[in-house]
């Protein structure tokens, strides 16, 4: 999940080595308001901060599990664990951008596990958000929501999240082979 989420976030957040002001805080790296040092300490971004891509990667790797925990708290462990990893990556990107899954309609959609409903709700529930932003920023955010929705919509079930264990798959495969051999024997 983390690798897929990193890829999505890097694509849409972009990298900035220098701190910049964004809405309510200084940001740096991949849109983060924090800097994580190699010893694990974390601090807020300040006006003249500069970081490397490696430092930004470290901060992003620390933050993604935090956003995952926020989502799990909002939708429940059972609902979250049933989602395919690719869908989780799209939802982590959304939460990273908004801070959480604030819309009840989206939380409710996630709890159903219906990927099409989740994707449609993600796009429609945020369509009129950010009305105060410039048209180019609104367009970029809409494109991001569409991309996240497509990730969710096209996600393939994880074997475990689909409720199928490796033991079940192997058992079914062995049963199919045995049945095939048995049917050949009966025909002979």
Residue ranges and their predicted role:
Residues 27-29, 90-95, 117-122:
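Structural recognition of the beta-strand scaffold that forms the well-ordered cores
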Residues 2-6, 82-92, 117:
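Alpha-helical scaffolds flanking conserved acidic
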Residues 165-187:
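Short, low-complexity, charged amphipathic interaction modules
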Residues 22-45, 65:
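Substrate-binding/active-site groove segments that recognize
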């Amino acid at each position: 999940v983390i690798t897929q989420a990193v890829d999505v976030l890097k694509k849409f957040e972009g990298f900035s080595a220098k701190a910049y002001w964004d809405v309510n805080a200084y940001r740096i790296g991949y849109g983060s308001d924090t800097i994580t040092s190699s010893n694990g300490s974390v601090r807020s971004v300040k006006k003249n901060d500069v970081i490397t891509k490696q430092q930004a990667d470290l901060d992003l790797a620390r933050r993604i599990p935090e956003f995952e925990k926020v989502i799990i708290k909002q939708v429940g462990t059972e609902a979250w664990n049933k989602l395919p990893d690719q869908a989780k990556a799209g939802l982590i990107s959304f939460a990273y951008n908004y801070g959480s899954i604030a819309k009840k309609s989206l939380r409710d959609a996630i709890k159903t596990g219906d990927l099409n409903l989740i994707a449609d709700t993600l796009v429609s529930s945020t369509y009129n958000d950010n009305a105060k932003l410039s048209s180019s920023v609104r367009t970029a955010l809409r494109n991001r929501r569409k991309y996240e929705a497509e990730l969710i919509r096209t996600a393939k079930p994880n074997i475990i999240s689909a409720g199928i264990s490796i033991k079940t798959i192997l058992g079914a495969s062995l049963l199919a082979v045995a049945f095939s051999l048995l049917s050949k024997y009966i025909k002979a």
